[in-house]
From Swiss-Prot:
UniProt xrefs under Gene3D superfamilies: Citrate Synthase, domain 1, Cytochrome P450-Terp, domain 2
Name the UniProt record assigns to this protein: Citrate synthase 2, peroxisomal
Known tissue expression: Widely expressed. Expressed throughout the shoot. Expressed in flower, silique, stem, cauline leaf, young leaf, mature leaf and senescent leaf.
E.C. number(s) listed in UniProt: 2.3.3.16
Family membership noted in the UniProt record: Belongs to the citrate synthase family.
Keyword Disulfide bond: no
Further remarks about this protein from its record: Citrate synthase is found in nearly all cells capable of oxidative metabolism.
Enzyme kind, highest EC tier: transferase
Lineage summary: Eukaryota, Viridiplantae, Streptophyta, Embryophyta, Tracheophyta
GO MF annotation, one: citrate (Si)-synthase activity
Gene: CSY2
GO biological process, one term: fatty acid beta-oxidation
Catalytic reactions of this protein: oxaloacetate + acetyl-CoA + H2O = citrate + CoA + H(+)
Pathway: Carbohydrate metabolism; tricarboxylic acid cycle; isocitrate from oxaloacetate: step 1/2
Length: 514
């Protein structure tokens, strides 16, 4: 079968059971699938096996070592431990701050080629899934490795929707928080609280082997996927002083999320189907991204045997960090500061002179155009056709054009990433900036859960306990406090001044009689 025929055949199958209720305009917005999007039919990596041996000569001792190389081009770090200079040497360690070139797991969930700008879920190009799939189906794909049949998809959607209600106790916790509580803080707290309401699924309470049961695992998966948007919506409504809205069982995943945000309790309300489809595509794009910071945190926590709710809460906490999940908010602030396209040349010069920071460009993995950003950029016009055009989009397009034609940025491989345009779309859809990261976290639950599930089946899974390279004092002996002398004048080596409130000063100024 020719490549184009294979693509058409794949699309025909997808279209038969993935069609959304209304995709008006999207067929013109999303790009046509390119002929190279046929990776779903390729079962082996193009480079073949990389298996062999690595010969290492230790110039310190003159010894020669043979280290096995796997078919995937990896060496076991523990094999380097045998490289030693003598009895007091504990063996060679890998020093890799930030895990720039360390693979703590083997995974079949997500593939990224940052140099070529490729992202695939279970072998499917992200462009193809964004074009034809739905978030709930992509969640199934990530979790179980294959696209579901029509009946499997129906069962999956129904089961997830049946677990969308949140325990009243969790809603009470959300309602007890301040009106100005950050939605991500609310999401972390509520996700962690779910552990308390499901003690039957906690290995610390119900036995370490509980997750060996497929039924138990699957139940936690649908619980979290179902409840995440309900919790997020409750956090959103809390900031407006409004009570939570019960989910609807008659809407799609993304429609239901918008329904809980906007219905004001009107059970007959239905979100705009085109906006719901845009949100669904954004959810697909954010669902998974292999071993990013928060996913690594989820797997790290899960390796201890902790319950999956705590693992996901910890992952969301990592996503809360501004270096991970908060970049799209920084992009909006940057574009607003630039103001108009006429100010871009001065801004570009400021970036080159290290006087200004450019947000939304560059990525830890991608040294090419982020494939997600390409899809999001095309979605912007669809959103603007419904809610009106955001003037900052003109600044964004002009900034991208200026940067990609400037040797300074091209040489450093600084291309737009997923955050560059997503913030503009979210703002156009009426979401406040503090809610952007929540819109990242809700779909990323699918990624966290698929990695959690995979780690449970991996025979190489161990409790994560990294080594360190100790650089401190080798040994010293205890001295009584009166005999100690100040060993350093450095402020970083002593306790600093912690300011106290005026109310505390007033209280301390008083006295109490016995």
């Amino acid at each position: 079968m020719e490549i184009s025929q294979r693509v058409k055949a794949r699309l025909a199958v997808l279209t038969a059971h993935l069609a959304v209720s209304d995709t008006v305009g999207l067929e013109q917005v999303l790009p046509a699938i390119a002929p190279w999007c046929t990776s779903a039919h390729i079962t082996a990596a193009p480079h073949g096996s990389l298996k062999g041996n690595l010969t290492i000569v230790d110039e310190r001792t003159g010894k020669k070592y043979q280290v096995p190389v796997s078919e995937h081009g990896t060496v076991k770090a523990v094999d380097l431990k045998k490289i030693t200079t003598g009895k007091d040497d504990k063996g060679l360690k890998l020093y890799d701050p930030g895990y720039l070139n360390t693979a703590p797991v083997r995974s079949s969930i997500c593939y990224i080629d940052g140099d070529e700008g490729i992202l695939r879920y279970r072998g499917y190009p992200i462009e193809e899934l964004a074009e034809s799939s739905t978030f709930i189906e992509v969640a199934y794909l990530l979790m179980y490795g294959n696209l579901p049949s029509q009946s499997q998809l129906a069962d999956w959607e129904f089961t997830v929707s049946q677990h969308s209600a949140v325990p009243q106790g969790v809603l009470d916790i959300i309602q007890s928080m301040p009106h100005d509580a950050h939605p991500m803080g609310v999401l972390v707290s509520a996700m962690s609280a779910l552990s308390i309401f499901h003690p039957d699924a906690n290995p610390a309470l119900s036995g370490q082997d509980i997750y060996k049961s497929k039924q138990v695992r699957d139940k936690q998966i649908v619980r979290i996927l179902g409840k995440a948007p309900t919790i997020a919506a409750a956090a959103y409504l809390r900031t407006a002083g409004r009570p939570p809205v019960l989910p609807s069982a008659n809407l799609s995943y993304s429609e239901n999320f918008l329904y809980m945000l906007d219905s004001m309790g009107n059970r007959s309300y239905k979100p705009n189907p085109r906006l719901a489809r845009v949100l669904d595509i954004l959810f697909i794009l954010h669902a998974e991204h292999e071993m990013n910071c928060s996913t690594a945190a989820a797997r790290h926590l899960a390796s201890s045997g902790v319950d999956v709710y705590t693992a996901c809460a910890g992952a969301v906490g990592a996503l809360y960090g501004p270096l991970h999940g908060g970049a799209n908010e920084a992009v909006l602030k940057m574009l607003a500061e630039i103001g108009t396209a006429e100010n871009i040349p001065d801004f570009i010069e400021g970036v080159k002179n290290r006087k200004r920071k450019m947000s939304g460009f560059g990525h830890r993995v991608y040294k090419n155009y982020d494939p997600r950003a390409k899809v999001i950029k095309k979605l912007a016009d669809e959103v603007f056709s419904i809610v009106g055009r955001d003037p900052l989009i003109e600044v964004a397009v002009a900034l991208e054009k200026a940067a990609l034609s400037d040797e300074y940025f091209v040489k450093r491989k600084l291309y737009p990433n997923v955050d560059f345009y997503s913030g503009l779309i979210y703002r156009a859809m009426g979401f406040p900036p503090e809610f952007f990261t929540v819109l990242f976290a809700v779909p990323r639950m699918a990624g966290y859960l698929s990695h959690w599930r995979e780690s449970l089946d991996d025979p190489d899974t161990r409790i994560m306990r990294p080594q360190q390279a100790y650089t401190g004092v080798w040994m010293r002996h205890y001295e009584p406090v009166r005999e100690r002398t100040l060993s350093s004048d450095s402020d970083k080596d002593k306790f600093g001044q912690v300011s106290i409130s005026n109310a505390s000063r007033r209280r301390l100024a008083g006295s109490s009689a016995l």
